[in-house]
């Protein structure tokens, strides 16, 4: 049986329950389907162990290509949450931290899109969300980045509307329940 190597992008380097939960749910679902897979977690900063006692290594997104060259990823899954924008913000990485770092959450979907294009790797969106319509300047860029997505699911109709306003075909975008409920 083939073992699938899957890269996951999300905010695994921040103590955030939902983002840390999805790889566990995914792994269990694959196991029930008889699919053997190895998960590689990537985040904007990375170089930490995943929280909540899971102890999986979280790699920085800039190492995505390097690890693909070594492990040959079969797919990249972009995690959910409010990531569909081009902004960064100041973020505490854990509850004991006192230092705010510049956290480029947009990298969790932009870098995988470029990577998938360059490497012809399957790209799957797992329910990311948007907060506001993109400025005119960003709409063509967003449309180009989304052409590499093989399966695009978003968390709500509002996010779907944001993407269709970028001329992404509505029939390519699926609105689904949070995957924690699958």
PLM features: residue spans?
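Aromatic- and Gly/Pro-rich donor/ligand-binding loops
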Residues: 1-135, 144, 180-182
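A nucleotide-sugar donor-handling region in carbohydrate enzymes
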Residues: 135-182
